[in-house]
Amino acid sequence: MPCSCKKYCDPWEVIDGSCGLFNSKYICCREK
């Protein structure tokens, strides 16, 4: 499922807790 890396998104939009980037502060969020 496509997602966008953001620092924050609504809990129900979170797909993965980490974006797989070096910075784990970004989360993978569901795209609108």
Swiss-Prot record:
Cellular localisation: Secreted
Keyword entries, A-Z: Antibiotic, Antimicrobial, Defensin, Disulfide bond, Secreted
Protein family membership: Belongs to the alpha-defensin family.
Disulfide pairings: C3-C29, C5-C19, C9-C28
BP GO terms, sorted: defense response to bacterium
Protein known as: Corticostatin-related peptide RK-1
Pfam families assigned: Defensin_RK-1
Role according to the record: Has antimicrobial activity against E.coli and activates ion channel activity.
Keyword Disulfide bond part of the UniProt annotation: yes
Primary subcellular site in the record, as a coarse category: secreted
Record bears the keyword Protein biosynthesis: no
InterPro entries the UniProt entry points to: Defensin_RK-1
Any one annotated GO CC term: extracellular region
